């Protein structure tokens, strides 16, 4: 069950870190990637069992598993290489863009975690499930969600 989504843009600077301008000119290999991505958080409801649901008349108690990141992905249609520079004696690392994209995916995931995506997933699930269960006729709804970290 998806309950929170963040869309994030990050700038990733990768490649060799030559501090000497001359060495960078000859041997450097740098990339600047503008990454757009989405992180979706929610709950794996396949972890629920009968013991996680207690019904007494019109009261219901539901114990959900901890929220988790379900998807963290780059939008390849919007993620672009802004700049790529290679030294005149360097053919370039053919995997540099792949490495930058992997770093971008991790950075986007970390940014969502720092932005509180798991807490937002918990809050949204509690609101949505409470409204749904009350619409089904339950008068008192208790939803327990353990805290989680990325």
Language-model regions: role of each:
Residues 1-150:
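Domain-level marker for long, solvent-exposed, non-transmembrane regions
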């Amino acid at each position: 069950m998806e309950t929170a989504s963040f869309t994030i843009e990050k700038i990733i600077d990768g490649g060799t870190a030559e501090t000497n301008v001359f060495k960078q000119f000859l041997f450097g290999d740098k990339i600047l990637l503008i990454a757009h991505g989405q992180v979706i958080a929610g709950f794996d409801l396949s972890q629920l069992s009968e013991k996680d649901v207690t019904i007494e008349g019109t009261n219901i108690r539901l114990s959900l598993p901890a929220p988790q990141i379900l998807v963290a992905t780059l939008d390849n249609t919007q993620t672009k290489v802004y700049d790529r520079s290679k030294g005149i004696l360097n053919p370039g690392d053919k995997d540099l863009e792949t490495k930058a994209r992997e770093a971008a995916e991790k950075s986007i995931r970390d940014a969502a975690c720092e932005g509180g995506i798991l807490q937002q997933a918990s809050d949204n699930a509690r609101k949505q499930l409470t409204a749904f269960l009350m619409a089904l006729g339950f008068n008192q709804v208790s939803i327990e969600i353990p805290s989680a970290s990325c």
